[in-house]
Amino acid sequence: MERVLKSARESGSLNLSNRSLREVPKEVYNNLDTGAQDEKWWEGVDLQKLILAHNNLEVLREDLRNLSSLVVLNISHNNISSLPAAIGDLPLLKSLDVSSNQINAFPEEIGFATALVKVDCSNNCLTDLPVSLARCLELSELNASNNTISVLPDELAGCSKLFRLNLEGNKLVTLSDKMFMSWTMLTEMNAAKNLLTAIPDGIGALSKLIRLDLHQNKITLIPPSIKDCSSLAEFYMGNNLLTSIPEDIGMLSNLGILDLHSNQLKEYPVGACRLKLSFLDLSNNSLSGLPAELGTMTTLRKLLLTGNPMRTLRSSLVSGPTTALLKYLRSRLSSDEGASGSGSTPTKDDQIAAARRLSLSSKELDLSGLGVTSVPPAAWETNDVMKLDLSKNSIEDLPNELSLCSSLQSLILSNNKIKRWPGTVFSSLASLSLLKLDNNPLAEILATDLEALSKLEVLDLSGSASSLPEPSAVSKLPHLKELYLRRMKLHGFPDSLLGLKLLRILDLSQNYLTSVPEGIKDLTSLIELDLSDNNITTLPPELGLLEPNLQVLKLDGNPLRSIRRTLLERGTKAILKYLKEKLPAE
């Protein structure tokens, strides 16, 4: 023990886990001061990290306040039933792990530990969370799963920096709109295994939400506002009381996993067939058939349908390979179309007119895939359109009339034949926050070309190798949050990207990168980094400093030699932890 304490006096970090301790050594409460004659006090370091996990501790004394420099405290997996008020006298405490104890209440003094960033109080006996926790304005991760909490204090809405919240396995009946409207930074939320009966309409405010797990509740309805959760990639709603799902769910363009098993669904809406899912679980519902349009979901790899009273599908299709079922549905779709009336096909003018009518209420004009060679006048005839989709056409130039669309926030020009940067038009679109120009034969983009788009938050230039912006160009986009540069024939990581402090998603896949700069650590807002299909052989340890914000790191298709494949298969968290541990000790 003396050797461990001596080492801790030098490093400021003490790990006494798995030692069958029944009480905390008194030297710990004395900030490692043993009073030994040969100690040189000036060589000592205040205790900053204390790990007492997996022991038999029953009490944490008020003397804890002596450890005023403590940043990390882990007392998980003990027999502690209460926390001392002194927890509030730790002004530097950022991480508190009290999980797997017998704690039945937090002291109100927890609210004075205002530096707290991460709190794990899972697997305890808590019936509520203290109102004072709302004073911890830096709180970004809260795990209160597997307790008996029945209500959350409204004041928690003040913790606006929360990005990961786990409330699984409690007794929550409701979640308030006020909280959802405030927690706009949330990327991951788990409220599974509760008693929830509804999802608040305010869910739409969570535009950064990537994973939402609400399985095993008593929810009867998914609100249409779910369509505004534009980043949602995984949505788990199994074991609820749903009888239908909204058509608008089809607008979730990033959704890859949708779990709706064990509900009371009687139909799967045609609108939801627009989703680009890889996994869809509809098992144990009341479905008697499926829309033929579901066959167009070519991204679907797994579709589960067992436990439904299917009357329009053979059992061999229901239980067979997903690809066979999709092929059958597609064939039914084509035969249905052939048998529906006169066989006349709507003209382009009809399609444009219909799209314009829809845009009057939605403010979104979809003119994609019409095969037009120029922008139809419908695009600028109403100047209040906020989203314009002109993708998958053969457009070569943007007309100056498009400058009239002063309300335009999203402009999608993917998969066209645009060669020249439409600077005149873009300079008039002051509200533009999303621009997709991927897969166009664009010429070089100058730094001055991007100056007019200073409010841009999302930019996609993928597949346009000759249009790689000048090195200083992206620095003109200080608000950029998402940048997609797939298939750009990049041979080096653009240093100018390292100054984009708000960047949350960076896609550099399918290039020729051989390395990643140490400066990647400066992109502290990143939640997704795609480096797949490059020539990267090693990763800098500094990449590990992006944990825990970075949630998705894609590395497939690289000849990585410095990281074992077994580690790569364990996913982002394991990789970042490994890299972080390789950093030299300070």
UniProtKB/Swiss-Prot annotation:
What the entry lists under InterPro entries is as follows: Leu-rich_rpt (IPR001611), Leu-rich_rpt_typical-subtyp (IPR003591), LRR_dom_sf (IPR032675), LRR_domain-containing (IPR050216)
Q: Which UniProt keywords apply?
A: Leucine-rich repeat, Repeat
Expressed, tissue-wise, as follows:
Widely expressed but at low levels.
Spans of repeat LRR: 44-67, 68-90, 92-114, 116-136, 137-159, 160-182, 184-206, 207-229, 231-252, 253-275, 277-297, 299-320, 359-382, 383-405, 406-428, 430-452, 454-476, 477-500, 501-523, 524-547, 549-570
Query: Which SUPFAM superfamilies does this one have?
Result: L domain-like
Which GO annotations describe the biological process of this protein?
A: intracellular signal transduction
Q: Show the Pfam families listed in the entry.
A: LRR_1, LRR_8
Phenotype upon loss of function: No visible phenotype.
**What is known about what this protein does?**
Leucine-rich repeat protein that likely mediates protein interactions, possibly in the context of signal transduction.
Task: Tell me its family.
Answer: Belongs to the SHOC2 family.
What is the official name of this protein in its record?
Answer: Plant intracellular Ras-group-related LRR protein 6
